Amino acid sequence: MSQKANYTKINSKMWDEWASAGGEWSLAINHQDFADATQGIFDIYLTPCKPVPHNWFIPFKKAKILGLASGGGQQCPVFAAQHAEVTVFDYSDKQLELEKMVSAREGYSIDLVKGDMSKTFPFKDETFHMIFNPVSNCYIQDVEHVWQECFRVLKKGGVLLSGFANPALYLFGEDEKELQAVHKLPYDGTKSSIENDEELIKNGGVQFSHSLETQIGGQLKAGFTLQALYEDHHHKGKITEYMPCYLATKSIK
């Protein structure tokens, strides 16, 4: 039987399994790419295919940066290579292990914090200059809580960079040959007919579509000012032939 009331633990286990299997968000940066990043040569992704424009970033040197649900050794090592003070907050042990592996290999310090972003963040008010949050809030039921916590822990003038799924992505089933609307929106994974935790993990965990009102409107409601936005496609799947599957936003406190 599934314990969907503890859905974030199911999703944490799913990410552990994805990381162990070498999933695309768990392929840690190699030494050459880290060395390039020390020279300012890098691409970082909030969404699958389109890199974040460099003019979205703050000056990294000595900046306090929070990688929110950003374990895996891909993005945060780049910030460290540019001499930022980096904290990674993630609920997956395996994703955090990849961060630890890269930091040990390259010889930099990083603060690794295991935690559930559906709860109150374990950080003081106005701690960080920037939050980097790649696609991940589809695994959290209350996304407006996440925006409120981001606003709280950012310093005044701080930057929130976030990637998230186009809600319409959840309208369709998994058929790769033909698109068919099968779910009403907003999609709520806790109402899935699947009752076995292992089966949920195989099917991508317990996910939530949210809405643009709670994604973008939720940032504004929390107090942010939206400064920039772009759309992105996925690198595979039938639906990406017809519409962008992801969005990324830059917002300012």
Model-predicted regions and their roles:
Residues S118-I131:
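A short acidic, Gly/Pro-enriched loop at the edge of an enzyme's catalytic core
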Residues V206-L229:
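Short alpha-helix
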